[in-house]
Regions:
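Alpha-helical transmembrane bundle of multi-pass membrane proteins
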Residues: 1-174
Length: 174
């Protein structure tokens, strides 16, 4: 779970900083904010309907598809209207993952250790995400999105080893 947190926070921070380096800053920033809102709204719902593995897998796949589209199509059309849409797809996937790991965290760890585990994963993942601004600002054009894509694929692959929850959380009919 700690590596999934690290991947998610790194990718989230990276895409936030990349939005400021694109030619169409304002449309990309607006699209990024909209994808955050939509991702946060549907993330918890996906988790309760599909479970942790499936919902995180689908969300990582959305972010991978968005990163592939930005890399292959978007950078050649950075001033076009299609570029903010592609950024939205990549950001939507990682926003959903971010919401799901917050909601799912108490179910993955036993209740006695959930707060300690949350603090530990936050500390380590925030340390790891500190390199994202340097990668976004100092790397050539495809490198940041390739790292986004690779780390999203790593997070999706690690879902195979994620246990379904041992902790407990209050559920409601949604």
């Amino acid at each position: 779970m700690i590596v999934i947190w690290m991947v998610t926070l790194y990718n989230y921070t990276l895409i936030q900083f990349l939005v400021n380096t694109f030619e169409s800053v304002y449309p990309s920033a607006i699209a990024s904010s909209i994808s955050d809102i939509v991702g946060y709204l549907i993330g918890g719902w996906l988790f309760y309907k599909l479970g942790i593995r499936v919902s995180l897998g689908v969300s990582f796949c959305v972010s991978i598809v968005g990163a592939i589209l930005v890399t292959l199509v978007g950078f050649r059309h950075e001033s076009s209207w299609i570029f903010p849409i592609l950024v939205t797809i990549a950001k939507l996937g990682i926003s959903i993952v971010y919401q799901i790991i917050y909601v799912a965290h108490p179910t993955v760890f036993p209740t006695l250790f959930a707060a300690t585990a949350f603090g530990l994963v936050q500390f380590v993942s925030n340390l790891f995400s500190m390199i994202a601004p340097a990668v976004a600002e100092n790397s050539e054009e495809p490198v940041p999105m390739l790292s986004f894509m690779f780390l999203s694929a790593l997070g999706a692959g690690l879902l195979l080893f994620l246990r379904e929850g041992t902790g407990s959380v209050a559920t409601s009919k949604f």
